[in-house]
A protein has these predicted regions:
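TPR/TPR-like (Sel1-like) alpha-helical repeat modules
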Residues: 82, 116-119, 133-156
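Register position in tetratricopeptide repeats
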Residues: 33-34, 66-67, 99-101, 134-135, ...
Length: 175
């Protein structure tokens, strides 16, 4: 029944495009909140035949991930970023889904791509530093901590990573 609602909204004007997108997201998110992400994916698929919009692709990826389809969600994010290279959220979601899928190498690669796009992304660099550390990649963790420090993030947590990996140099440097 609810899927028929989307067909009635079909039009080519910008206002109608936004109405399709908003209506679709509202309906699909209702399905997701009810624990029915497979129906949300159906809503997004139908909406995408009527309105090509980055918000639909992004939310569809979330619904795929809700089903544990991390590879599909990752591939959708990668393809969507190619179409919408200004939406860095696709790369961030792709990194998250790779991490959830246990693909550490893929996760590291995508995080580095994000940092090429925005070298001052504190959250991504910190998460990457922590992931390197958890995976016994000491040099890589140290390098990320050093970049953060040099960017002006002279925080105790960053200092702890620096001191952990190069104690001779950092033990005498205080905040």
């Amino acid at each position: 029944m609810a899927l028929l609602c989307l067909c009635a909204c079909r039009s080519t004007s910008g206002t109608d495009h936004d109405q399709i997108v908003r209506t679709s997201i509202d309906l699909a998110e209702t399905y997701r909140s009810q624990g029915r992400p497979e129906l949300a994916v159906e809503v997004y698929d139908r909406a995408l035949t009527q309105a090509d919009d980055y918000r639909l692709y992004y939310n569809k990826a979330l619904a795929l991930a809700d089903q544990g389809l991390y590879t599909d969600a990752t591939e959708l994010c990668a393809a969507s970023f190619e179409r919408y290279p200004y939406v860095i959220s696709f790369k961030k979601a792709q990194a998250l889904f790779l991490d959830l899928a246990g693909d550490k190498d893929g996760y590291f690669d995508v995080c580095l791509e994000i940092l090429e796009l925005n070298p001052y992304d504190f959250d991504t660099r910190t998460e990457l530093m922590e992931a390197y550390s958890e995976n016994d990649m000491d040099k890589e963790a140290y390098d990320q901590a050093l970049i953060l420090w040099n960017q002006g993030y002279m925080l105790d947590t960053i200092h702890q990573y620096l001191e952990k990996y190069n104690p001779e140099y950092w033990e005498n440097i205080s905040l």
